[in-house]
Design a protein with these regions (language model features):
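Juxtadomain coupling helices with adjacent low-complexity linkers
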Residues: 231-273
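Amphipathic alpha-helical effector-binding/dimerization core
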Residues: 78-176
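Short, solvent-exposed recognition segments
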Residues: 2-12, 138-213
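Short hydrophobic beta-strand micro-motif common in sensory/regulatory domains
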Residues: 216-220
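N-terminal helix-turn-helix
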Residues: 2-100, 260-268
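Sensor-regulatory modules in signal-transduction proteins
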Residues: 222-225
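Short, structured helix-loop boundary elements
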Residues: 22-26, 82, 95, 99, ...
């Protein structure tokens, strides 16, 4: 199945209500970088201009600047990002203790259940992957650090949304845009609110083929020293690989144990900072 591009940037527009310190040219340059993603790794000048809302001439200037800085390469007709763009996010990721704390637990869980495991955080209306141990490829999209998916259609997203207070959840539901990614995807605020209530009762989430057909994912909350949900850990499997009874009896307990272990280590780290 082909999953829609969920990382496409918003078209850059003039922002008359912005702060006097707002730098429009910087916003435009960042939009060019964000135009590239898992579904658009190589793009023409016209593609970039269309994705960002910039003129071809303006998009070309930004692309040439990014080439000079080492963030973009070109063969004369197509443009693509270089690994150097990872530096832009590395300062933030390296400052987090979470990925370092989580990784050994993800590795242990992946070894135990023979499935891929991940940790993500909530950013706006998306989940963003900050740690991952891949075992087998299930999805058609390649998942790496920084990959984003819409929170409403993912197990990790629903766990993170369940950790919000009611006002924060209402704010999310008012601005989220629901799309039927598969025939199983929840597409209304009312349905999602009911799903989140179930997550809060159970302490974990199972999403069955809502982000991609054939993909079943489980997620549980990671909490900091104060008990606040700060991230989510998940494991993903093919929907046909396990009966739902096995999922509840074997995979869920293993996942909850991992979430608890990460939370404990994270709290210990924060206490000693």
């Amino acid at each position: 199945m082909s999953t829609p591009d969920v990382t496409a940037p918003e078209v850059v527009r003039e922002n008359p209500g912005a702060s006097p310190d707002y730098v429009q040219s910087l916003a435009r340059g960042l939009s060019v970088i964000k135009a590239f993603g898992a579904h658009a790794q190589r793009q023409s000048l016209s593609d970039v201009a269309r994705a960002t809302g910039l003129t071809r001439a303006t998009a070309r200037r930004f692309l040439l600047t990014l080439i000079e800085l080492g963030y973009v390469r070109t063969d004369g007709s197509q443009f693509w990002l270089t690994p150097r763009v990872l530096e832009l996010g590395y300062s933030y990721l390296s400052a987090l203790t979470l990925p370092e704390v989580a990784r050994p637990h993800l590795e242990a869980l992946a070894e135990k259940v023979k499935e891929s495991t991940s940790v993500s955080v909530l950013d706006g209306t998306d989940v963003v992957y900050v740690a991952r141990v891949p075992v087998s490829r299930i999805m058609t999209v390649t998942i790496t650090l920084g990959t984003r998916f819409p929170a409403y259609a993912t197990s990790m997203g629903r766990v993170l949304l369940a950790g919000l207070n009611d006002d924060e959840l209402d704010a999310y539901l008012s601005r989220a845009e629901f799309a039927p990614i598969t025939g199983n995807t929840v597409t209304t605020a009312e349905e999602l609110r009911a799903e989140i209530a179930t997550v809060r009762r159970n302490g974990y989430c199972i999403v069955d083929q809502e982000l991609e057909e054939g993909l079943r994912s489980l997620a549980a909350p990671i909490r900091d020293a104060s008990g606040t949900v700060v991230a989510s850990v998940n494991l993903s499997t093919h929907a046909a690989r396990y009966r739902m009874e096995t999922v509840h009896d074997e995979l869920v307990p293993a996942l909850l144990a991992t979430a608890g272990a990460i939370s404990t280590d994270l709290a210990r780290t924060q206490t000693h900072q």
